[in-house]
């Protein structure tokens, strides 16, 4: 499976705090931002760099910068917005694209009700953010939309993933790497990740 479980002590610690049944909206929201920041560091580890000259205090010196077009971060509405600030803390120059999906009542498959992409998508790396990778339907649909725009360098950043969701993404898009804080046990009969986080969107927005 093309999945990278970020096994960092701080990531594991913060994720456990989010799993607590009495985790407040404020605490859950804050931890989602902190985790996204830590995980984005790992997801950006292989960014390509290039050399260039700068004027330093002692004269001209050679330095490094990220090569190519600026990253676009792609939150899946609505829960993905809860991770956005964490990624932007680390990469404040990132451009933001947004995808909103809902389930078709007849086919039960996710369909887009809103999408807004930045320019030059075919030249930018894209980082999709969503707290939960459950069945994988929304993630696969979002990747489909990005590839239709010509995007070739795509990664997914999720807090918790189920094996079923990882398999769905790997089967449909084996070139996309998934970064997650935990690969959990399974989905229950209602499609919730076990042990998971519950409804991450409700917890982030305080609508539970």
Swiss-Prot record:
InterPro entries: PRibTrfase_dom, PRTase-like, Upp_B, UPRTase/APRTase, Ura_phspho_trans
Cofactor: Mg(2+)
Keywords: Allosteric enzyme, Glycosyltransferase, GTP-binding, Magnesium, Nucleotide-binding, Transferase
Catalytic activity: UMP + diphosphate = 5-phospho-alpha-D-ribose 1-diphosphate + uracil
Gene3D superfamilies: 3.40.50.2020
TM spans (from-to): none
GO terms, biological process: UMP salvage; uracil salvage
Intrachain disulfide bonds: none
GO terms for MF: GTP binding; magnesium ion binding; uracil phosphoribosyltransferase activity
Record's protein name: Uracil phosphoribosyltransferase
Species the sequence originates in: Neisseria meningitidis serogroup C / serotype 2a (strain ATCC 700532 / DSM 15464 / FAM18)
């Amino acid at each position: 499976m093309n999945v990278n479980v970020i096994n960092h002590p701080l990531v594991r610690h913060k994720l456990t705090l989010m799993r607590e049944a009495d985790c407040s909206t404020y605490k859950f929201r804050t931890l989602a931002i902190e985790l996204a920041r830590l995980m984005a560091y790992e997801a950006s580890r292989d960014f390509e760099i290039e050399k260039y000259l700068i004027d330093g205090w002692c004269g001209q010196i050679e330095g490094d910068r990220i090569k190519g077009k600026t990253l676009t971060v792609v939150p899946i509405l609505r829960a993905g917005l809860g991770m956005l600030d964490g990624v932007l803390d680390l990469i404040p120059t990132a451009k933001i694209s947004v995808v909103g999906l809902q389930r078709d009542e007849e086919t039960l498959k996710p369909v887009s009700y809103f999408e807004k992409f930045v320019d030059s998508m075919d030249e930018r790396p894209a980082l999709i953010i969503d707290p939960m990778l459950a069945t994988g339907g929304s993630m696969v649909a979002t990747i489909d939309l990005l590839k239709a725009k010509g995007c070739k360098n795509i990664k997914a950043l999720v807090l918790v993933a189920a094996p079923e969701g990882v398999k769905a993404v790997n089967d449909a898009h084996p070139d996309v790497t998934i970064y997650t804080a935990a690969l959990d046990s399974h989905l229950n009969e209602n499609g919730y990740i076990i042990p998971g986080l519950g409804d991450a969107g409700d917890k982030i927005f305080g609508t539970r």
